[in-house]
Amino acid sequence: MSSGGLLLLLGLLTLWAELTPVSSKDRPDFCHLPADSGSCKGNFQAFYYHPVHRTCLEFIYGGCEGNANNFKTMDECKRTCAA
């Protein structure tokens, strides 16, 4: 296969991987944890996956502790947990 064909194949595979939604069986277990602001008193915008609504929602993170269902951006949350 030519290098152009390989490059096209790589591009198509990358596009497929980006557009394929995360299935519930592939979703990490921590995506089902509740939002946890932690014990610190900070005021940081964060996002968590809400399994009942099957979407990512905003919450206020205190800055320490909490759990792994805590993302800095909506996009990161959606890529990791949302179907």
Swiss-Prot record:
SMART domains: KU (SM00131). Disulfide bonds join C31-C81, C40-C64, C56-C77. Keywords: Disulfide bond, Protease inhibitor, Secreted, Serine protease inhibitor, Signal. Coiled coil: none annotated. It is found in: Secreted. Serine protease inhibitor. This is Kunitz-type serine protease inhibitor 161. It comes from Drysdalia coronoides. The lineage of its organism: Eukaryota, Metazoa, Chordata, Craniata, Vertebrata.
